[in-house]
Swiss-Prot record:
Any one biological process term the GO annotation gives: 'de novo' IMP biosynthetic process
Reaction(s) this enzyme catalyzes, per UniProt: N(2)-formyl-N(1)-(5-phospho-beta-D-ribosyl)glycinamide + L-glutamine + ATP + H2O = 2-formamido-N(1)-(5-O-phospho-beta-D-ribosyl)acetamidine + L-glutamate + ADP + phosphate + H(+); L-glutamine + H2O = L-glutamate + NH4(+)
Domain of life: Bacteria
InterPro entries documented for this protein: Class_I_gatase-like (IPR029062), PRibForGlyAmidine_synth_PurQ (IPR010075)
Family matches, as PROSITE patterns: GATASE_TYPE_1
UniProt source species: Staphylococcus aureus (strain MSSA476)
Active site: C85 (nucleophile), H193, E195
Domain Glutamine amidotransferase type-1: 3-223
Pfam families: GATase_5
Record text on subunit structure and interactions: Part of the FGAM synthase complex composed of 1 PurL, 1 PurQ and 2 PurS subunits.
GO MF annotation: an example: glutaminase activity
Protein's name according to its UniProt entry: Phosphoribosylformylglycinamidine synthase subunit PurQ
Pathway membership: Purine metabolism; IMP biosynthesis via de novo pathway; 5-amino-1-(5-phospho-D-ribosyl)imidazole from N(2)-formyl-N(1)-(5-phospho-D-ribosyl)glycinamide: step 1/2
Entry keyword Nucleotide-binding: yes
Length: 223
Protein backbone atom coordinates (compact mmCIF):
# COMPACT_ATOMS: atom_id res chain seq x y z
CA UNK A 1 0.00 0.00 0.00
CA UNK A 2 1.21 3.49 -0.82
CA UNK A 3 -0.17 6.77 0.51
CA UNK A 4 0.06 10.17 -1.15
CA UNK A 5 0.73 12.88 1.43
CA UNK A 6 -0.44 16.14 -0.12
CA UNK A 7 1.63 19.27 0.43
CA UNK A 8 0.17 22.77 0.02
CA UNK A 9 1.81 26.13 0.71
CA UNK A 10 1.31 26.45 4.46
CA UNK A 11 0.95 22.74 5.27
CA UNK A 12 2.68 21.98 8.56
CA UNK A 13 1.63 18.44 9.44
CA UNK A 14 2.75 16.71 6.25
CA UNK A 15 5.80 15.18 7.91
CA UNK A 16 3.68 13.91 10.79
CA UNK A 17 1.31 12.28 8.28
CA UNK A 18 4.24 10.77 6.39
CA UNK A 19 5.66 9.39 9.63
CA UNK A 20 2.28 7.94 10.62
CA UNK A 21 2.02 6.09 7.31
CA UNK A 22 5.54 4.68 7.55
CA UNK A 23 4.97 3.68 11.17
CA UNK A 24 1.91 1.68 10.10
CA UNK A 25 4.08 -0.38 7.76
CA UNK A 26 3.31 1.03 4.32
CA UNK A 27 4.91 3.36 1.79
CA UNK A 28 4.27 7.09 1.54
CA UNK A 29 5.32 9.89 -0.78
CA UNK A 30 4.91 13.65 -0.64
CA UNK A 31 2.83 15.01 -3.52
CA UNK A 32 2.90 18.70 -4.43
CA UNK A 33 -0.45 20.46 -4.86
CA UNK A 34 0.49 21.37 -8.45
CA UNK A 35 0.70 17.75 -9.56
CA UNK A 36 -2.09 16.41 -11.75
CA UNK A 37 -1.83 12.66 -11.19
CA UNK A 38 -2.12 10.29 -8.25
CA UNK A 39 -1.53 7.22 -10.37
CA UNK A 40 0.09 4.44 -8.37
CA UNK A 41 -1.28 5.55 -5.01
CA UNK A 42 -3.71 3.54 -2.91
CA UNK A 43 -4.83 6.29 -0.55
CA UNK A 44 -4.54 10.00 0.22
CA UNK A 45 -3.56 11.81 3.42
CA UNK A 46 -4.42 15.53 3.54
CA UNK A 47 -2.52 17.15 6.41
CA UNK A 48 -3.24 20.03 8.71
CA UNK A 49 -1.75 23.48 8.58
CA UNK A 50 -2.79 26.74 6.98
CA UNK A 51 -2.97 26.04 3.26
CA UNK A 52 -2.49 29.24 1.28
CA UNK A 53 -2.50 31.16 4.57
CA UNK A 54 -6.22 30.39 5.11
CA UNK A 55 -7.01 33.30 2.79
CA UNK A 56 -10.71 33.67 1.89
CA UNK A 57 -11.40 30.91 4.45
CA UNK A 58 -9.71 27.73 5.58
CA UNK A 59 -9.33 25.28 2.71
CA UNK A 60 -10.96 27.51 0.10
CA UNK A 61 -7.93 28.13 -2.08
CA UNK A 62 -6.61 24.59 -1.67
CA UNK A 63 -9.95 23.31 -2.95
CA UNK A 64 -9.13 24.49 -6.48
CA UNK A 65 -5.54 23.20 -6.56
CA UNK A 66 -4.65 21.01 -9.59
CA UNK A 67 -4.29 17.84 -7.48
CA UNK A 68 -7.86 18.02 -6.16
CA UNK A 69 -9.47 16.41 -9.21
CA UNK A 70 -7.29 13.35 -8.58
CA UNK A 71 -8.31 13.27 -4.92
CA UNK A 72 -11.93 13.17 -6.04
CA UNK A 73 -11.14 10.40 -8.51
CA UNK A 74 -9.51 8.19 -5.88
CA UNK A 75 -12.39 8.84 -3.49
CA UNK A 76 -14.90 7.83 -6.18
CA UNK A 77 -12.91 4.63 -6.72
CA UNK A 78 -13.35 3.77 -3.04
CA UNK A 79 -9.77 4.39 -2.00
CA UNK A 80 -9.20 5.74 1.53
CA UNK A 81 -8.89 9.51 1.93
CA UNK A 82 -8.11 11.02 5.33
CA UNK A 83 -8.18 14.76 5.96
CA UNK A 84 -7.07 16.08 9.33
CA UNK A 85 -7.67 19.64 10.58
CA UNK A 86 -7.05 21.79 7.48
CA UNK A 87 -7.43 18.54 5.53
CA UNK A 88 -10.96 18.17 6.96
CA UNK A 89 -11.71 21.76 5.97
CA UNK A 90 -10.52 21.02 2.43
CA UNK A 91 -12.70 17.91 2.20
CA UNK A 92 -15.80 19.94 3.09
CA UNK A 93 -14.82 22.66 0.62
CA UNK A 94 -14.56 20.17 -2.26
CA UNK A 95 -17.81 18.43 -1.35
CA UNK A 96 -16.42 15.03 -0.37
CA UNK A 97 -17.81 15.54 3.13
CA UNK A 98 -20.90 17.50 4.21
CA UNK A 99 -20.97 20.51 6.50
CA UNK A 100 -18.44 23.25 7.17
CA UNK A 101 -15.87 24.28 9.76
CA UNK A 102 -16.49 27.65 11.44
CA UNK A 103 -14.53 29.78 13.88
CA UNK A 104 -14.35 28.33 17.37
CA UNK A 105 -17.04 29.69 19.67
CA UNK A 106 -14.32 31.27 21.80
CA UNK A 107 -12.79 32.99 18.73
CA UNK A 108 -9.45 31.76 20.08
CA UNK A 109 -6.91 29.32 18.67
CA UNK A 110 -7.02 26.10 20.71
CA UNK A 111 -3.91 23.94 21.12
CA UNK A 112 -4.07 21.10 23.64
CA UNK A 113 -4.86 17.43 24.09
CA UNK A 114 -8.55 16.54 24.03
CA UNK A 115 -10.41 13.43 25.14
CA UNK A 116 -12.56 11.92 22.40
CA UNK A 117 -14.98 9.03 22.10
CA UNK A 118 -15.10 6.50 19.27
CA UNK A 119 -18.82 6.46 18.49
CA UNK A 120 -18.63 4.22 15.41
CA UNK A 121 -15.95 1.53 15.24
CA UNK A 122 -17.36 -0.08 12.11
CA UNK A 123 -15.35 1.98 9.62
CA UNK A 124 -12.06 1.57 7.78
CA UNK A 125 -10.59 4.21 10.10
CA UNK A 126 -11.84 3.01 13.49
CA UNK A 127 -12.18 -0.78 13.29
CA UNK A 128 -9.27 -1.42 15.67
CA UNK A 129 -10.87 0.64 18.44
CA UNK A 130 -13.58 -0.53 20.82
CA UNK A 131 -17.02 1.02 20.49
CA UNK A 132 -17.18 3.85 23.01
CA UNK A 133 -13.42 3.79 23.58
CA UNK A 134 -11.95 7.02 24.93
CA UNK A 135 -8.83 8.31 23.20
CA UNK A 136 -6.58 11.35 23.49
CA UNK A 137 -5.67 13.31 20.36
CA UNK A 138 -4.11 16.78 20.20
CA UNK A 139 -6.18 19.60 18.71
CA UNK A 140 -4.74 22.78 17.18
CA UNK A 141 -7.22 24.98 15.35
CA UNK A 142 -8.99 28.31 15.23
CA UNK A 143 -11.76 27.17 12.89
CA UNK A 144 -12.80 23.78 14.21
CA UNK A 145 -16.48 24.31 14.96
CA UNK A 146 -18.22 21.67 12.84
CA UNK A 147 -21.52 22.97 11.49
CA UNK A 148 -24.23 21.39 9.39
CA UNK A 149 -27.93 21.84 8.80
CA UNK A 150 -30.43 19.80 10.80
CA UNK A 151 -31.23 17.85 7.64
CA UNK A 152 -27.59 16.90 7.08
CA UNK A 153 -27.20 16.06 10.76
CA UNK A 154 -30.11 13.63 10.59
CA UNK A 155 -28.52 12.02 7.53
CA UNK A 156 -25.19 11.69 9.32
CA UNK A 157 -26.92 9.97 12.24
CA UNK A 158 -29.04 7.70 10.05
CA UNK A 159 -26.01 6.57 8.04
CA UNK A 160 -23.70 6.19 11.07
CA UNK A 161 -21.31 8.72 9.54
CA UNK A 162 -20.33 10.31 12.85
CA UNK A 163 -17.28 8.42 14.10
CA UNK A 164 -15.63 10.65 16.68
CA UNK A 165 -16.98 13.04 19.31
CA UNK A 166 -15.44 15.40 21.83
CA UNK A 167 -15.97 14.45 25.47
CA UNK A 168 -15.60 18.12 26.47
CA UNK A 169 -16.50 20.12 23.37
CA UNK A 170 -13.75 22.75 22.94
CA UNK A 171 -15.08 24.67 19.95
CA UNK A 172 -18.88 24.52 19.82
CA UNK A 173 -19.13 21.76 17.21
CA UNK A 174 -22.65 20.56 16.46
CA UNK A 175 -23.45 17.63 18.80
CA UNK A 176 -19.77 17.47 19.86
CA UNK A 177 -18.80 16.13 16.41
CA UNK A 178 -15.04 15.77 15.93
CA UNK A 179 -14.90 13.44 12.92
CA UNK A 180 -17.13 12.02 10.19
CA UNK A 181 -17.01 9.78 7.14
CA UNK A 182 -18.82 9.91 3.80
CA UNK A 183 -21.71 7.56 3.04
CA UNK A 184 -19.42 5.04 1.37
CA UNK A 185 -17.13 5.10 4.40
CA UNK A 186 -13.84 5.63 2.56
CA UNK A 187 -13.45 9.39 3.10
CA UNK A 188 -12.82 10.62 6.63
CA UNK A 189 -12.34 14.09 8.06
CA UNK A 190 -11.55 15.09 11.63
CA UNK A 191 -10.24 18.17 13.41
CA UNK A 192 -8.14 16.36 16.08
CA UNK A 193 -4.68 15.14 15.07
CA UNK A 194 -4.17 11.34 15.26
CA UNK A 195 -0.84 11.74 13.45
CA UNK A 196 0.42 13.67 16.48
CA UNK A 197 -0.66 10.87 18.81
CA UNK A 198 1.83 8.12 17.96
CA UNK A 199 4.20 8.07 20.95
CA UNK A 200 3.48 7.76 24.67
CA UNK A 201 6.67 9.75 25.22
CA UNK A 202 4.88 12.70 23.60
CA UNK A 203 1.76 12.24 25.70
CA UNK A 204 -0.43 9.78 23.78
CA UNK A 205 -0.28 6.97 21.24
CA UNK A 206 -4.05 6.85 20.69
CA UNK A 207 -3.66 7.66 17.00
CA UNK A 208 -1.63 4.58 16.08
CA UNK A 209 -4.68 2.36 15.69
CA UNK A 210 -6.36 4.74 13.25
CA UNK A 211 -3.58 4.42 10.70
CA UNK A 212 -3.21 0.69 11.34
CA UNK A 213 -6.96 0.32 10.78
CA UNK A 214 -6.68 2.01 7.38
CA UNK A 215 -3.91 -0.37 6.36
CA UNK A 216 -5.77 -3.41 7.72
CA UNK A 217 -8.94 -2.51 5.82
CA UNK A 218 -7.02 -2.01 2.56
CA UNK A 219 -5.14 -5.29 2.91
CA UNK A 220 -8.33 -7.21 3.58
CA UNK A 221 -9.58 -6.06 0.19
CA UNK A 222 -6.36 -6.31 -1.82
CA UNK A 223 -4.05 -8.94 -0.33
Amino acid sequence: MKFAVLVFPGSNCDRDMFNAAIKSGVEAEYVDYRETSLSGFDGVLIPGGFSFGDYLRSGAMASVAPIISEVKRLAAEGKPVLGVCNGFQILTEIGLLPGALLHNDSHLFISRNEELEIVNNQTAFTNLYEQGEKVIYPVAHGEGHYYCTDEIYQQLKANNQIILKYVNNPNGSYDDIAGIVNKKGNVCGMMPHPERALETLLGTDSGVKLFEAMVKSWREQHV
